[in-house]
A protein has these predicted regions:
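A conserved beta-strand-loop-helix scaffold within acyl/acetyltransferase catalytic domains
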Residues: 4-7, 12-76
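Alpha-helical elements of the RecA-like P-loop NTPase motor core of helicases
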Residues: 13, 116-117
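Residue-level detector of high-confidence beta-strand sites
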Residues: 55, 128-130
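Conserved acetyl-CoA-binding loop-helix of GNAT-fold acetyltransferases
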Residues: 77, 83-98
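Conserved GNAT acetyl-CoA-binding A-motif
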Residues: 91, 98-111
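Short glycine/proline-centered loop/turn elements that form peptide/ligand docking sites
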Residues: 91, 114-115, 134-138
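Conserved active-site tyrosine of GNAT-family acetyltransferases
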Residues: 119-120, 125, 146
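Intrinsically disordered, low-complexity, positively biased terminal segments
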Residues: 133-183
Length: 183
């Protein structure tokens, strides 16, 4: 599996460039994300040809029925670096980091239905939380970023995919809504 590393303060420009290239988001949204939600230890990167070619963020903060959750967001790989296992390495490292930091559950909302199987086969994730609605509790900085992002994208899946740390019972979580997906 390719090597990954935690992001560094000097990576912000390269991360912003990759984010814009893959997602097309504007500079205001990306800047708000870095200001409100991101710390270097929440981001993993993989490099190819001497530059950041893949990234992902795993954001702590939400709670579901007393369980600490983390959320994988903005997984992106440069088009010319795809199919090399970079994103899989980044995602695996993010999940490992989250569990080592005390998360009970790591969740994500795949960008489209086609990615659900990718998250399932690479990381053992399965459908869990409902997209939208009450249930999961979020910190204030998440609420602030959500106001900038806007509402849900109707084209994203209706369930978040998640994996629990060993020994964690997820019974009852399938009825909880996860309102802040930033999609």
């Amino acid at each position: 599996m390719p090597d990954t590393r935690l992001s560094r303060a000097g990576d912000k420009g390269a991360l912003t460039e990759l984010w814009q290239a893959v997602f097309g988001d504007n500079a205001e949204l990306i800047s708000a994300f870095f200001s409100l939600l991101c710390r270097p230890e929440y981001c993993r990167v993989a490099c190819a040809d001497g530059k950041i070619a893949s990234m992902g963020f795993c954001l702590p903060g939400p709670e579901a029925m007393g369980l600490k959750c983390a959320y994988i967001y903005a997984m992106a790989t440069a088009e010319d670096a795809r199919s090399r296992g970079l994103a899989a390495a980044v995602g695996a490292a993010l999940i490992e980091d989250a569990f080592e930091s005390g998360a009970d559950i790591v969740a994500t909302l795949p960008a489209d239905e086609g990615l659900c199987a990718w998250y399932e086969t690479r990381f053992g994730m399965s459908p869990l939380f409902k997209k939208g609605g009450p249930g999961v509790v979020f910190p204030d900085n998440w609420l602030e970023f959500a106001r900038i992002c806007g509402g849900h994208d109707p084209d994203t899946p209706q369930r978040l995919y998640a994996v629990a740390r060993g020994g964690i019972d997820t019974a009852g979580l399938e009825d909880l809504g996860w309102e802040l997906t930033f999609d």
